Amino acid sequence: MTDGKDLEAEIHPLKSENRKVPENAGALAGKEPRGTPAPQTRLSHCRTAAFFLSLFACLLVVFVVSFIIPCPDRPALQGVWRIDYNAAVAYDFLAAEDVNKDKIQDILFLYKNTNSSRGNSSFSCADEGFSCPCTFVAAVSGASGSVLWERPVAQDRAFVECGILQPRGSAAPSACVVLGRPGSLVAVDTLTGKTLWSQPSSFGGNASVLSPLLRVPDLDADGAPDLLVLIQEENQVNGSIYSGGTGQQVSPPDSLGVDGTSGSILHVTRAGAHYVLIPCGTALCSRSVKGLYEKVSRRDSPLKSDPLWEDMLSAASHRLVVHSSGAIRYLMNVPGKAGDDLLLVSTEAYMLLDGQDLTPRWTFGTTQVLRKPVLGYYKPDTPAVLVENGTGPDRQVLLLDLGSGAVLWSQALPGLPGDPPSASLPTADHRSAFFFWGIHEPTDSNQTEPGAAGRRLYMLHPTLPGVLLELDNVSVPIVAFQVVLLEPGRHAACILLTGPASPSPPGLVSVTKHKVQDLVLAGRVVHLAEGGAESDQAVRDRLSRLRYRSEA
């Protein structure tokens, strides 16, 4: 019988428990007064109340965030916009900066107008002491193309450097510094267009400014980087240092003892010393910023000097020993293994020099180089340089590995005189999309005049090396061209400044923005080799899904 009860208990455990409850009920009732809830019941009620209170609090927070607190307005980005200026001329300058702080890059440019203004500005040439026409700097919204501000800054052609940080406590975080003719140095608040400071320069009437304006370390301790201005007068290059915070001269003009040309750069050696490098024919001229400042100011400088470079520099000619084949056209600081190296571009070769001892790492021979090369990434996180070799029908576009000089990609692509420089934009896969101008016609094409329909913009991505995508066809003169990431990761755009360039007669000047993704979806696919595996639409779809990233 006992075994039978145990078996029944195993089969029906709940029934066994129910039978035991009445037996124990009396004992429990005797120990606890009637009407008093059990401790477990009170705890259960507390837990239930806490659950509903927390649920109510969560719902309240969701309600407040969703319906009461307004979401920040995100400006609607137009795929295409255009702004026109009649009877104007344009200058080769485009810059991108978030002017109105809407987290979208805006566009700054220069133009010279025969009228006092386009009608969007409350300032005329006469308001700033200039005769009509004069040079304006303008900022337009990258989202819509609406004019944010414009202001006259110079009588004639100007050199501009934007993104100059201002001293702490200044009303403006950054400024565009404009050097115009006649010589005047003006800083314009990039947020409002208001003049922060204006200083006359000490340039002679026959002096010519060698662009660009070079940023040097803060020598006057005002919290803003200073500017080195190089001018050429009577076959001599003179240098003056101006405060980036006030425009006042930090050091008066002094001869660098060289007769260089434009295209100078500021190079920092492995020892942290700053040297100005200037193309001087087939040679490379240089002066240390420390030596230039201390010579004219007769004060000590916090800057460093590099004994190795001082030994390499000729005391008489200020020339560095560089064996260049042909006249030097361009100098570029490029990323190296232990600091910046130097890419030297002459009329006959590209040469990568070690950034410290200037020994050649590699040389790539060319026939004729007219444009500055463009840096990018052909392989993931591996720097490459896009170069243009030759001109006209003999032009060739190449991508070289920056570390070795090896050819990664090449394509014959005839060009036209006055084609804009190439551009690149990093993509999310740690490569770059490359943009360049040219004319690609099939071998069976009946077109007798290359480029008769206009200049054509092509796009190349390294994941599709056998395909070019023709994005645009422009028939008007192009003064400046840039590919800009207006919004991180999502909105890349081509910016074109077209019209007559100074000193041509005035005409219609236009600034146009095209969204890259829209151009890709409507682009013409050019197969460089037979037997492409993907259809034209598949190529367009694949390239339209590219995500872009900002420069590191």
Curated annotation (Swiss-Prot):
Entries under Gene3D superfamilies matching the protein: YVTN repeat-like/Quinoprotein amine dehydrogenase
SUPFAM superfamilies assigned: Quinoprotein alcohol dehydrogenase-like
Extracellular topological domain residue ranges: 70-552
Membrane topology: Single-pass type II membrane protein
GO CC terms, sorted: cell surface; membrane
Subcellular location: Membrane
Top-rank taxon, per record: Eukaryota
Transmembrane segments: 49-69
Keywords: Glycoprotein, Membrane, Signal-anchor, Transmembrane, Transmembrane helix
Sugar-bearing residue positions: 115, 238, 473
Family designation: Belongs to the FAM234 family.
Protein name: Protein FAM234A
